[in-house]
Amino acid sequence: MAGTLVIVAHPDLAHSRVNAAWAAAARDCATCTVHDLYATYPDGPIDGAHERALLEAHDRIVLQFPLTWYSCPPRLSEWMVTILKRGWAYGPGGRALQLKTLGIAVSTGSNGADYSPDGRYGHTLDAVTLPFELLAIHTGMHYLPAFTLTGVRDCDDAALAQSAMHYVRHLRHAAPRRCASGQDDDRAKTRYPTG
């Protein structure tokens, strides 16, 4: 088990500047595996066994996506529901991701000032992406600080190249901002809805 799995979830990566540049930079990183969800599953069902094997083969997982209606694109949401099953990712017997590291890389057209308590949205980008940190907590994973680029519509080529360089550094060296305990949280006593 080694390396970083970068799961790219951009609905139109061929016409993306930022996510395409980040994915290309990650592909050039010897310790990274880039997995494009939209290219792998353009319109068919997601292969759960294949996806779980990819996750099991890596110790760091980074979900890379453009912020879409203050969340992730639909294919990534579908992927999470399909792959992160009770008994595998969480709940009784669900220890497959325990003590791995999860991170997100998010781009957004809105500028950074929009994502502040006094900004246009009244919340920070960390607050908007909190569900991903909660996913890490629920599955027993460490959580990296988010890698973000805001104001992408105004991003020139030099800023984009610098962002891609910083992204690779982040993929290789970022330390978790929240560490999982690694101890059994007695999830067997947690009641989960059935049906």
Feature annotation, model-predicted:
Residues 1-35, 167-169:
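N-terminal beta1-alpha1 ligand-phosphate binding loop
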Residues 2, 97-101, 141:
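A short helix->loop->beta-strand "cap" motif at the edges of active sites that frequently abuts
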Residues 17-21, 46, 74-78, 158:
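Generic recognition of short, well-ordered alpha-helical segments
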Residues 23, 131-195:
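Glycine-rich phosphate/pyrophosphate-binding loop and the adjoining helix
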Residues 30-38, 142-148:
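Short beta-strand elements in bilobed, periplasmic/extracellular small-molecule ligand-binding domains
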Residues 32-55:
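N-terminal beta-loop-helix "entrance" segment that forms/cooperates
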Residues 49-133:
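Helix-loop-strand module that forms the ligand-binding subsite of alpha/beta enzymes
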